[in-house]
Amino acid sequence: SVGFKAGVKEYKLTYYTPEYQTKDTDILAAFRVTPQPGVPPEEAGAAVAAESSTGTWTTVWTDGLTSLDRYKGRCYRIERVVGEKDQYIAYVAYPLDLFEEGSVTNMFTSIVGNVFGFKALRALRLEDLRIPPAYIKTFQGPPHGIQVERDKLNKYGRPLLGCTIKPKLGLSAKNYGRAVYECLRGGLDFTKDDENVNSQPFMRWRDRFLFCAEALYKAQAETGEIKGHYLNATAGTCEEMIKRAVFARELGVPIVMHDYLTGGFTANTSLAHYCRDNGLLLHIHRAMHAVIDRQKNHGMHFRVLAKALRMSGGDHIHAGTVVGKLEGERDITLGFVDLLRDDFVEQDRSRGIYFTQDWVSLPGVLPVASGGIHVWHMPALTEIFGDDSVLQFGGGTLGHPWGNAPGAVANRVALEACVKARNEGRDLAQEGNEIIREACKWSPELAAACEVWKEIVFNFAAVDVLDK
């Protein structure tokens, strides 16, 4: 006998190992598994471990040419999801040798690859990953990080303010640049290309870059503050993307932008490396994330996409608002905001954090709150996100009845009032509206904004909530 027996055997015989002691070098994954009727949870968890590592559907001759014990993924724990009849959390450990160094692309190709189409599973969601320090050290991470960005901008002790230029599509480059200038002159730190502004017939990228650079230099000269506009370098090829980033650097602007999910992790990591080498900050938009992360039983939670972005590289990333028009429960949002900013984050299931994560000094990422927010939200945003964040008001700036610059003034006054009140010991959560009303007395721009948006709310329950 050669020790080979053809045929199909249950995954759990090889890949379900409840006695396994995880190693410090393992990548750990928490999957929400919904097995098909009749499939035991142990078999489903083992199938996930197998199909995302060394396994296939049948025994093969070449298994004997390597050490499966060294390379296989292992399902080492399964727990039932509270309040759900047929959902389980399957914990899987992957040996580090399965993954190419410095490649988010390779990591995801294994862990969230073909296994998500596996017939024995009705649904599968990756809830969290523990990335070991040994693997993190193979990544550059964010081009600069929070402290270096503050030093570059010379801005401390408050959140940064931004605005997405609207309408997002259709403006000529010159009119677009005019809107940028008005917002920056009014007191914002940044303006932003919308995620789908690339290089369309109505506004080619080079023209936009030139007019926006002119706008921010003019605003800098008038205000004495350093200003930025997120020039979207996202393109159809990596080569074109880098060409646009090179032109931005030649113009001397401080920051460029990338749509990291539609652009892809390979392109994003290349751009992050270019940005560090050339002194550019990198703003990241998460367009397409809700396709992946919004359903509670299938896909991938945004906290995983956030960790992947910190590894791939970005200085800012959109992270929901809690109070605006886009999905995001407070505890869950603050959980992944900490994973973006902090160096060490403890396991905390009450905030959706399944594993303790040590980032071993990888630079942090500023979370960007954007989507349906306005001046009345300023106290809540300041209280929820703290100083190390970017608060981005698109319609909440450009929708001001007096124009773009007064809209920017209103936001800056509201922010300064909230920061001052907080520093004096006032409770933003309880006294927020009163603080804004007091500031209105000496800012007619803020008073006008408060009148326009006094009744705007987005009262819809979040889809992705914690298991109770």
Curated annotation (Swiss-Prot):
Coiled coil: none annotated. Transmembrane segments: none annotated. GO terms for cellular component: chloroplast. Binds 1 Mg(2+) ion per subunit. It catalyses: 2 (2R)-3-phosphoglycerate + 2 H(+) = D-ribulose 1,5-bisphosphate + CO2 + H2O; D-ribulose 1,5-bisphosphate + O2 = 2-phosphoglycolate + (2R)-3-phosphoglycerate + 2 H(+). GO terms for molecular function: magnesium ion binding; monooxygenase activity; ribulose-bisphosphate carboxylase activity. It is found in: Plastid, Chloroplast. RuBisCO catalyzes two reactions: the carboxylation of D-ribulose 1,5-bisphosphate, the primary event in carbon dioxide fixation, as well as the oxidative fragmentation of the pentose substrate in the photorespiration process. Both reactions occur simultaneously and in competition at the same active site. The basic functional RuBisCO is composed of a large chain homodimer in a 'head-to-tail' conformation. In form I RuBisCO this homodimer is arranged in a barrel-like tetramer with the small subunits forming a tetrameric 'cap' on each end of the 'barrel'. This is Ribulose bisphosphate carboxylase large chain. It comes from Solandra grandiflora (Chalice vine).
